[in-house]
């Protein structure tokens, strides 16, 4: 998804290039991958059944900065799952969270961005991005579900 977006979106490529010039991504100082989880319920708020309620995970680079992160265009969707299906999975949200985090590491635990990942930008130039998952953003109920614990 990132590969395709950088090649086809002039705006996203420009944002990324600018941030890399002001805050380089290096092996010694990799960028932070931010995971964001939110519940989405498109049904009527007064409905008794909320069968369309979903759990959505997104990701972006924290290093893009708050101005960029305020726009949905810099967030990538990792997965969308029906809430009622998630509740049937052993471990529920914690299992889904683990599966999402697995998308950023190989079966042997290797971080895909640890050695740098090369991408071609819209203008044809290339960049190397080092990054690691190092931040999770969610409201308190979502955090509770994601780590499967009681928050008092």
PLM feature spans:
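Domain-level cores of phosphate- or acyl-group-handling catalytic modules
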Residues: 11-152
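Low-complexity, highly charged intrinsically disordered N-terminal segments
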Residues: 1-14
């Amino acid at each position: 998804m990132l590969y395709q977006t950088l090649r086809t979106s002039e705006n996203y490529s420009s944002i990324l290039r600018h941030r890399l010039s002001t805050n380089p991504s290096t092996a010694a100082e990799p960028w932070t991958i931010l995971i964001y989880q939110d519940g989405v319920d498109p049904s009527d708020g007064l409905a008794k059944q909320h069968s369309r309620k979903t759990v959505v995970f997104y990701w972006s680079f924290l290093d893009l900065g708050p101005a960029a992160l305020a726009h949905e265009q810099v967030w990538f969707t990792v997965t969308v799952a029906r809430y009622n299906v998630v509740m049937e999975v052993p471990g529920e949200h914690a299992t889904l969270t683990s599966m999402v985090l697995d998308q950023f590491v190989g079966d042997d635990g290797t971080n895909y961005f640890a050695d740098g990942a090369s991408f071609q930008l819209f203008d044809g130039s290339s960049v190397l991005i080092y990054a690691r998952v190092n931040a999770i953003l969610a409201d308190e109920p979502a955090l509770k579900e994601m780590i499967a614990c009681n928050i008092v």
